[in-house]
Amino acid sequence: MSNINKEIECCPPFDPAPWDDKIVEWVNKPFVKDKVFTIFYMPVRFGAAIRRVDKKVTKAAAKMVDWLCLCDHTSKWNMDVYVAVDKEIPDAHNKLLSGKFYSKVYEGNFNNTGKWCQDYTGIVKEKGLVIKKMYMWYTTCPKCAKKYGKNYVVIISELV
């Protein structure tokens, strides 16, 4: 992928500190939307979707911001992905997100996702916040998670 530092095989290392237990406000933050086929919520050819987006981003002389990729599991068979970019990308489905978002970082095997979502929902309620839309950010592919020794997943929700 052209936007990745050549020393990094695939996914850049992830620093959880800026994302753990944080509220951020976005005003017209640009994203590019793509889709990934899933089988019972498990993505199939996720990397192909990222490569499609990267090709369009590179062609537009743009950048993927923080490798932020919000995943919206719309059904057992589909996941919409929103990749943060630094400008509008021609020939892409551009989407602007605005609002307050709460993020919490989790680490471990993907089969813990259900537990993480329950924990996250509890934390949000304890803080007196209300979720409008929940996204998952899988910060590295399984191969890179193994290489780095950590599998960070960030749950990010748009708040009411």
Regions found by a protein language model. Give the residues of each.
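A solvent-exposed interaction/effector surface
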Residues: 1-160
